[in-house]
């Protein structure tokens, strides 16, 4: 596709270093392709969790993406990540392709497992204390209400990810989820060595290492939002427990349970109602109006500058510079972009 063609007509995204994101990726037609499984011998013994960890570790260090929290649900996945170099688009492209291809081979699927859209990744920002839990919607956003000491938007989004199996009515606690869900303690740092899944990647594959290290931790930029790491854990655990209690009340303590989850076919599909055409936010500030106004202004300024550069390119001008944070037009087509803005001195 030539630059300026149909593929570039969608709203451009800006990727800036030092940004937190909530990442969501959904399976096509809400199919349960990521359903929790266990290695039971046979030709394909690697679990979906194993495939996720290998693919993530394979590209995370290269692109400077640091994983803070993860939950693999049956038909979608949630992550909270820190994008150190402004390359989250490249990371997601490479990681998701490898992960999807391995899962596709595992189940003998003729097509990919993820929806064709880029997925959802919300920029997280806003250090103002979050709204009361009663004022939260089902997706961790705020409906209003006064601030409390529950923590920052980052705290609440991490707790939302970790509580997902409970909120969905599947298990009574995150610890009971048979799939992969991280814990609050993982924010202090956790690393595991993951072997190359030989069922999907050849033993003599020079591009993919025999072993990679999958790591999780809160970066210093996250801990800096709190007095110290202990305060971060306390705030996150408190938010998580409030979400769990709220979900238990909502489901009247009736959950599907581990055995029923494990018995779910990877070829089954979710049948619950889902509204069609819901708008997907690109920023989440959770009630911090000052941060929201600033981010919206920055986003509009970026899109305006991008549009001006793109129109100049279409008009025949070849020496075009795109705004800082431009992704595809810079990384794929090689057009220069402005330098990243220098952070203000503290």
Language-model features: locations:
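Short catalytic/metal-binding and nucleic-acid-binding patches
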Residues: 1-346
């Amino acid at each position: 596709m030539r630059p300026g063609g149909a593929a570039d007509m969608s709203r451009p995204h800006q990727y800036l270093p030092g940004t937190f994101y909530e990442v969501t990726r959904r399976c096509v037609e809400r199919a349960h392709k990521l359903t929790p499984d266990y290695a039971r011998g046979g030709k394909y013994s690697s679990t979906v969790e194993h495939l996720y960890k290998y693919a993530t570790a394979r590209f995370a260090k290269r692109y400077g993406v640091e994983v803070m929290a993860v939950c693999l649900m049956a038909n979608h996945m949630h992550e909270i990540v820190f994008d150190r170099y402004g390359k989250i688009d490249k990371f997601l492209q490479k990681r998701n392709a490898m992960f999807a291809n391995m899962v596709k081979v595992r189940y003998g699927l003729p097509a990919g497992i993820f929806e064709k859209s880029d997925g959802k990744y919300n920029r997280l920002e806003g250090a103002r204390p979050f709204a009361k839990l009663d004022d939260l919607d089902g997706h961790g956003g705020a409906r209003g209400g006064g601030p409390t000491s529950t923590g920052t938007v980052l705290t609440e989004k991490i707790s939302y990810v970790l509580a997902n199996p409970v909120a969905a009515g599947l298990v009574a606690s995150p610890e009971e989820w048979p799939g992969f869900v991280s814990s609050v303690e993982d924010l202090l740092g956790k690393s595991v060595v993951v072997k190359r899944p030989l069922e999907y990647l050849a033993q003599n594959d020079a591009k993919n290492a025999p072993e990679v290290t999958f790591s999780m931790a809160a970066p210093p930029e996250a801990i800096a939002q709190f007095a110290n790491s202990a305060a971060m854990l306390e705030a996150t655990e408190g938010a998580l427990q409030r979400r769990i209690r709220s979900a238990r009340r909502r489901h009247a303590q009736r959950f599907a349970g581990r055995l029923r989850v494990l018995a779910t076919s990877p070829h089954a599909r979710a049948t619950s109602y889902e509204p069609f055409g819901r708008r997907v936010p690109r920023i989440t500030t959770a009630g911090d109006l000052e941060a929201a106004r600033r981010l919206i202004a920055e986003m509009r300024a970026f899109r305006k500058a991008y549009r001006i550069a793109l129109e100049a390119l279409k008009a025949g001008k070849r020496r075009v510079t795109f705004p800082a944070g431009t992704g595809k037009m810079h990384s794929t087509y090689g057009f220069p972009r402005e330098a990243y803005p220098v952070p203000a001195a503290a």
